[in-house]
Amino acid sequence: MLTLDTLNVMLAVSEEGLIEEMIIALLASPQLAVFFEKFPRLKAAITDDVPRWREALRSRLKDARVPPELTEEVMCYQQSQLLSTPQFIVQLPQILDLLHRLNSPWAEQARQLVDANSTITSALHTLFLQRWRLSLIVQATTLNQQLLEEEREQLLSEVQERMTLSGQLEPILADNNTAAGRLWDMSAGQLKRGDYQLIVKYGEFLNEQPELKRLAEQLGRSREAKSIPRNDAQMEAFRTMVCEPATVPEQVDGLQQSDDILRLLPPELATLGITELEYEFYRRLVEKQLLTYRLHGESWREKVIERPVVHKDYDEQPRGPFIVCVDTSGSMGGFNEQCAKAFCLALMRIALAENRRCYIMLFSTEIVRYELSGPQGIEQAIRFLSQQFRGGTDLASCFRAIMERLQSREWFDADAVVISDFIAQRLPDDVTSKVKELQRVHQHRFHAVAMSAHGKPGIMRIFDHIWRFDTGMRSRLLRRWRR
C-alpha cells in the first residue's frame, strides 16, 4: 500500500510547512502562554522539546498509510499520464467510472469538464490531467492535516499532563534552569496526581525544617575527588575502520527530487513528450523537483588517530555525584523517617540544579536501590518516599554496597553519605580498613548525617564529616522556639 510520505514526494507536497504551522499554533495556545508566564524556568525546557515533537510528527507522516481509494486513484492518474491523446479518449469512460466508484472529489468536475466539450483535444487532455493533479494535491494536503490534527490533540494532552506535574514540583525540585530542564525530562512518565503528591508533602515538610535544608546545602558544597585529564600523557596510535560514501553508485536506494536527467522516472520523461506539459517539465528541471532514482554506495577505509596512553589524574574538585545510604531500622521510624526522606529530597534538588547524580540505597536486612536523578527519577523518588522504616540495622552491608559502587568508573568521584542514628554494632575490621584505604588512596569522602545524639563514637570516627541533626524532643522544641 502507498505511504503518505511517497504520495507527498510524488505530488511535491511539502509536509514541513504543515508541521511548522502546527507547532507554532501549539506553542501559541492559551494553556502554554499562561504556563510560561507562571513558570518561566520551564519555558526553555519545553522549547527544547520542539525538535523531538518535529521528529515525531515527521515519523508519523512517513509511516502513515494512504487510504486504498486514494491509492487506486493515484495509480490511475499515473497511468493516464503515459497515454497519448487518442489512447486517453479510449480510456476516458473507464477513468470516469473509476472516479465515480471511488467517490473522488474530482469525479463530478471531471464529468462536467468532459460533457462541456464535444470533442477531446490535446489541450483538453492536458487540462484534465492538470486539474486532476490539483485535486490529488488537495486530498493529500487534507490527509496530512487530519493526521497532524490528531497528533496535535494527543501532543497537547501529553504536554498539559506534564505541565501539571512540573508545575506542582517546580517549587520543590527546580532551583535553576538546569533543574527545570531535568525536571521536565523526568515528567515524561505515566504519573497520576495522587502519586506525586507524596513529593509535595515531603517538600512542605522540608520547608518547615530550614535547619535540615541548610544542612543539605552545606553538604552539597563540600569537595570530593574528581578525575581530570593529564597534560603530559604519552600518545599512542589507535586504528579503526570508518564507512564513507563511495564515488561510484552501487544500487538503487529509493526516490528523490533532483535535476539528474540520466536517472529520471518514466512518468517524468513522458511529460516531456506532451507539448502542453513541456514548460512544466523544464520548470521542475530548473527547480530540481523531477522524480529520479537515488543511487547509493559505500566504502570502508582504515583511519588512524592518536590518543593518550594514560587518560586521567585525580585531584580534588567540587560537585561529584551522591551515593546516599539510609538506615531503615525501627529506631529510624516516625520523625526520624520524615527527616531522612526530606533530606534525600533536598539532595535530589541539589543534584538536579548542579547536573549531578543522586543514588539512594536503603539498608536494613537487605539493600534497596533508587536513582533519583535518572530519566525515571520522579517515579523512583515516589517509590523511595513510600517505603516504611521497620527493618534492622546492618551498617556493614551498607558500607560494602557503597564501596562496590565506588569501584565503578562512573561513580569514582562520588560523595558517600550515610543517614542513620548510628545506634548499631561496631563495624568489622575489614570494612574499616577498606574505607580508610579509599579515603587515603582515592580521596573519597564519607559523610555521616547523625539523626541522634546517642550514636556510637566508635562507628562515627570513620567518617570525614559528621553533620548532626538531633531529632530528640528537646532539640525539636528549641529549633521551633528559635524560629
UniProtKB/Swiss-Prot annotation:
Gene3D superfamilies, alphabetized: von Willebrand factor, type A domain (3.40.50.410)
Gene of this entry: viaA
Domain of life of the organism encoding this protein: Bacteria
The entry's keywords: Chaperone, Cytoplasm
Primary localisation category: cytoplasm
GO CC terms: cytosol
Protein name from the UniProt record: Regulatory protein ViaA
HAMAP family, alphabetized: ViaA
Naturally occurring in which organism (per UniProt): Escherichia coli (strain 55989 / EAEC)
Function (record text): Component of the RavA-ViaA chaperone complex, which may act on the membrane to optimize the function of some of the respiratory chains. ViaA stimulates the ATPase activity of RavA.
Quaternary organization: Homodimer. Interacts with RavA.
